[in-house]
A protein has these predicted regions:
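Conserved small/polar residues in nucleotide/adenosyl-binding loops
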Residues: 160-167
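Charged, surface-exposed helical/loop "interaction arms" that form contiguous linear patches used
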Residues: 145-159
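Conserved amphipathic alpha-helical "coupling/scaffold" segments
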Residues: 1-146
Length: 167
């Protein structure tokens, strides 16, 4: 019997669909689709531990970020090309996503050892680059607009489609 057939008989195909429908980004939806059916008891146990820890966080931890999960993959992939740049909207999205990552890592660093150990271990591999967020903060205000203190050249580059109000 194939794994797809076993998955359908057990109803996990429907569970996958329910989870996929609740995903807030294209990346999360794709990751859900890529998850493979498993019969390995060790892997199933690990997945259940992660799921249960996240369920507990969602139910009881008010300080865990519930928003700010933005799909940045498309414009970050473009930035790997030499000479590419980022538009103002994408820069604002990146700022939000970096802040969410910072808040997630802060949440787990403030949690006592032994609480949510599996998720804490998973999050421990996240590397933050505060310089990037600080640099974005020198460019954008809290509303995602170019700050008045941004250089004239940067201001004009980011707003090339409209005349600079500084003129």
């Amino acid at each position: 019997m194939t794994e797809e057939r076993i998955e359908a008989i057990l109803g996990f195909d429907r569970v996958r669909k329910i989870i996929s429908d609740r995903c807030s980004t294209e990346y999360a939806t794709a990751r859900t689709a890529e998850e493979n059916f498993s019969t390995d008891a060790r892997e199933i146990r690990q997945r259940l531990l992660l799921t249960d820890e996240m369920r507990m966080i969602v139910m009881f931890e008010e300080s865990f970020p519930s928003n700010g999960y933005i799909d940045c993959v498309r414009f970050l992939e473009i930035l790997t090309n030499e000479g590419s740049n980022i538009d103002l909207v994408s820069l604002g999205k990146l700022k939000t996503m970096l802040e969410t990552l910072r808040r997630i890592t802060l949440f787990f660093s403030n949690i006592k050892d032994g609480i949510y150990p599996n998720l804490k271990k998973m999050v421990s591999s996240i590397v933050l680059f505060p310089e990037v967020q600080q640099r974005i903060d020198t460019i954008l205000d809290k509303f995602g607009n170019v700050k008045d203190t941004a250089s004239d050249e940067l201001y004009d580059c980011l707003l090339y489609t409209s005349p600079s109000p500084r003129d």
